[in-house]
């Protein structure tokens, strides 16, 4: 069938109870869709987006999945084009099912080294990382999770021009900023889907727009989390369906928050990467917006050793390595040395890559995380420095 700017209604009439639906389809252009369903005597409608492609699959939980909501029947769906092109669309199948709720809030997975928490109610960002070999008494969760902005999570920056309506944060006008966890008002992003296998946790969400207090974005974020010995490996994917023209911006890849206790920031500032040269350290980092130059770390030409870490005075801490970046911003907010993951104080790292978001075209990248003594962190990243390249950015 041909889909245009006008809604095309497709009757479903599936009368079995469900909290998850799955489409198999082929579409020549992206589509904006709705699902109408019955729930406790009421008709409800929720929105979803389909990427263009052949023999594609889209799966989504119902809006109330984490609250154990179950719909009574799938009545119909609508589809319309987002771009100016008509779409040739084939719905191969539309199925519904009732699946268990993985967790109402945090889903945990672990190996012999780490226990990791995925915050399902906050878009599937990482809210918990416990190192089972941590030598520091009282340090359990190394990550800060004070609010929806404080996770290890995806965060992107786009347009500030009409028709987009700017938001506001800390007294500043704020551009389009899809954030995995939610928005500045602590509204939660919607969990779209999640899957758990023996070695991997997959999550997908529809993020909020950070500068707005409520509302959502026309975008999806996906993560694949894998524990591999002493490493946490994270793959990321983002697709924007807004149709807006975005300028090039420094994208946080990812936004990364630890507890305040890890007070020393280490990085390699030389020009002979992976040669075990002397590391640089700053132990007095301020809140990053208060002094951008002091909190900005630009690698020298040819330096591919772009990991960094926050560690305590004994050298223990947490490191992050995102290859093929432009520079890194790091800082400490309300530094007080707290080990409390819920504290207002925190440390922050954001490797930045200058990328112009292109609607309907996926952004993909990966990074590594490891905990331990500083020399162990460095050695582990060196051992796997060629495993991730993030060269997809170069052709985006």
Predicted segments, located by residue:
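Beta-strand-rich recognition/accessory modules
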Residues: 102-114, 121, 298-396
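Extended, loop-rich substrate-binding clefts of extracytoplasmic carbohydrate-active enzymes
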Residues: 161-229, 243-247
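Acidic (Asp/Glu-rich), glycine- and aromatic
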Residues: 219, 230-273
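Extended extracellular/luminal ectodomain segments enriched in beta-structured repeat modules
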Residues: 15-22, 70-72
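Short beta-strands within extracellular/lumenal beta-sheet-rich domains
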Residues: 3-17, 58-59
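Extracellular carbohydrate recognition and processing domains
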Residues: 40-71
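Exposed low-complexity, polar/acidic, P/S/T/G-rich flexible segments that act as propeptides
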Residues: 82-101
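Beta-strand-rich N-terminal accessory domains
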Residues: 99-166, 371, 378-392
